[in-house]
Amino acid sequence: MGRHYEIVLLVHPDQSEQVQAMLERYKALIENGHGKIHRLEDWGRRQLAYPIQKLVKAHYLMMNIEVEQSVLNELVDLFRFNDAILRHLAIKRSGPYTEQSFIMKSKDDKGDKPERRRRDDDESGDVGVSNDSDNDGGNAEAA
C-alpha cells in the first residue's frame, strides 16, 4: 500500500474553531487517495517553546497516516498554502502507530491525580519563625 507518516500541525490559535473543518478536508483527501488514518489526536491549545509570528500559543494536531507519496505531497502543499497553519512536520515512520501518544496519556493522567496542595496551604503562618535548636545564630565556626 503506502508509506507510514506521522504529521504534526500547529494551527493559529484564533482558528481553533475551524480545526474540525480542516481535519475533515484532510481526511477526505487521504481516504480519496486510498490512504488510512491510523491515529488522529487533537492536543488542543498548548504553549509554544518560542514565539512564532508573535504568538505564544498554538492549536496542536497529530496524525499517523498511511498514504502514497503523491497524496502526502498534496497534503504538504495544502499545509504550506494555508495561512492558519503556523508549522507542519511530516516524518516517515517504519509502521503504523495506533497507541495513544505520550502527550495524550499525560493529559489523561492529570485528570486521575488528586489535586496537589499548594505551598502556601502547607505553611500555616509559621513563616519566619525559626527553631532555636537548629539555628545557633551563625556561630557554627566559633564552636
Curated annotation (Swiss-Prot):
Keyword Phosphoprotein assigned: no
CDD domains with a match to the protein in the record: bS6 (cd00473)
GO molecular function: small ribosomal subunit rRNA binding; structural constituent of ribosome
Record region (Disordered): 100-143
Pfam families (alphabetical): Ribosomal_S6
Basic and acidic residues bias spans: 105-121
GO process terms (BP): translation
Keywords: Ribonucleoprotein, Ribosomal protein, RNA-binding, rRNA-binding
Cellular component GO terms held in the UniProt record: cytosolic small ribosomal subunit
The keyword Transferase is assigned to this record: no
InterPro entries: Ribosomal_bS6, Ribosomal_bS6_sf, Ribosomal_S6_plastid/chlpt, Transl_elong_EF1B/ribsomal_bS6
Top-rank taxon, per record: Bacteria
Ranges of Low complexity composition bias in the record: 126-143
HAMAP family: Ribosomal_bS6 (MF_00360)
Role summary: Binds together with bS18 to 16S ribosomal RNA.
Family per record: Belongs to the bacterial ribosomal protein bS6 family.
Stated name of the protein: Small ribosomal subunit protein bS6
Organism the protein comes from: Xylella fastidiosa (strain M12)
Gene for this chain: rpsF
